[in-house]
Amino acid sequence: MDASTINSLFLIGALLVGASILVSSLSSRLGIPILVIILAVGMLAGVDGGGIIFNNYPTAYLVGNLALAVILLDGGLRTRVASFRVALWPALSLATVGVMITTALTGLIAAWLFNLSLIQGLLIGAIVGSTDAAAVFSLLGGKGLNERVSATLEIESGSNDPMAVFLTVTLIDMIASGETGLHWSLLGHLLREFGIGTLLGLGGGWLMLQLVNRINLAGGLYPILVVAGGLVMFSLTNALHGSGFLAVYLCGLVLGNKPIRSRHGILHMLDGMAWLAQIGMFLVLGLLVTPHDLLPIALPALGLALWMILVARPLSVVAALLPFKAFHGREKGFISWVGLRGAVPIILAVFPLMAGLPDAQLFFNLAFFIVLVSLLVQGTSLPWVAKLLKVTVPPDPAPISRSALEVHITSEWEMFVYRLGAEKWCIGAALRELKMPEGTRIAALFRGEQLLHPSGSTVLEVGDMLCVIGHEHNLPALGKLFSQAPQRGLDLRFFGDFVLEGDAELGAVAALYGLKLDGLDAKMPLAQFIRQKVGGAPVVGDQVEWHGTIWTVATMDGNKIQKVGVRFPEGTRPGPGLFL
């Protein structure tokens, strides 16, 4: 490869990445997932468009694995362990039982539609059987889903790859060797994948945490060290026949949930690297496909994709979530719809090509077609379906920016910047009149371009920008004081006519609103009653019905229900409320 060729590669690569970023601005306007747009850029530049011929499957496999490792590391860093209280076991059930059921149901129809053997059909089912972390993390961000739904989908997408990889590799080996039967030893291989991945992921995350917090480096080197450590865990786990995808996700999870040096610098750089990984991966996968090869299989492939979306995924979700009573029908319906396929199925479809199996090109084209349909149909409709099934909650008010104050190695102090909107009650109030959360301080106040020195007598005006020092747990209280109201089309009465304290006694609540206890303990706290009715770990937005009234979990403090909203039937006149 001479210098001119290398220069051309740099030029083409930079132009494609730049074009993907610029065209991605159409995503929100057209309601099309950004991943579809990037995939389309790759296809348009490929053999049937710009004429770039790319058919190097090992390179695509390399790029895909590297990109997914970075994306999963970033996803783990941003996942809160607190969300595991409501989603860990349901997500693991979906990642194992759900994938197996989806594989079986999809495989049966694939074998029939394309006149393949049963084991070849099951291989297609295994290739497209797992949801994709890149697609889920990208498309669910900012949708305002309740914690039970969002955490379940994110943990599922981060942990279901081992099952899909295991089934794919096993079925490829069986086809290559001419075997037709399954053996119990396969269960041991699966447990080994999960076990080694979990052990090395958690252990590697802990070692990386100690390393980052004990050495002094230039600020920009910590994110690079974290990425390098994540890739070491990914490759080492794969070398030991464990799940590298699971390991790198858990490594990020450990790092993201412990005090760590340069946290915001790490998260900021990983965000950019995750975006670059997604763009590069979907561009390469778009270049890899030959669009005119998809036309002959379009009709049966569309039928298979719709079968998987409308039948296989919903049935697998219902079966996998059967033991978990906290999930109501609307949540199961939404989880069924968000069976997003992305890069993982396309990368898994490269395995048969590299193994030289018959009909391997058909498997690849089918996987690509199903991913395209999934992103277009499911990804495009996510906001509408979430609103229809009522699985969203009003978002917490947020500062316009936040940055870390590295007072010491594991400092958790941050600076939050708020712009005061006209709708905030604090406009016209003096600073001394504000009920600031304990432990927070106003560090600076900007009015226009002028920096003011805030004092107790300073009166707040519309457009003022406040810099507040505090901790992450202060954000809800600060948000009520200073944040701009989010522009969302959610019902302003989402939580009800009144909001009550969770520790209010059931007897007092019943007497206040004229409700019958029907044998319930009058001393029982309202929060405990709601928890029992939910049937599992509650989340903000959970609703239960009691004597025609709707009770909604309004705020949580860890595992504890802090406040509950109550809504009365239309046309009724409620008694006095326990206003907050």
Swiss-Prot record:
It comes from the Bacteria. It catalyses: K(+)(in) + H(+)(out) = K(+)(out) + H(+)(in). Residues 402-484 form the RCK C-terminal domain. HAMAP family: NhaP2. This is K(+)/H(+) antiporter NhaP2. Keywords: Antiport, Cell inner membrane, Cell membrane, Ion transport, Membrane, Potassium, Potassium transport, Transmembrane, Transmembrane helix, Transport. Pfam families: CorC_HlyC, Na_H_Exchanger, TrkA_C. InterPro entries: Cation/H_exchanger_TM, FAD-bd_PCMH-like_sf, FAD-bd_PCMH_sub2, Na+/solute_symporter_sf, NhaP2, RCK_C, RCK_C_sf, Transptr-assoc_dom. Its main location: membrane. Belongs to the monovalent cation:proton antiporter 1 (CPA1) transporter (TC 2.A.36) family. NhaP2 subfamily. It is a multi-pass membrane protein. One of its GO terms (molecular function) is potassium:proton antiporter activity. The chain crosses the membrane at residues 6-26, 34-54, 57-77, 86-106, 108-128, 162-182, 193-213, 217-237, 240-260, 269-289, 292-312, 334-354, 362-382. SUPFAM superfamilies: FAD-binding/transporter-associated domain-like, TrkA C-terminal domain-like.
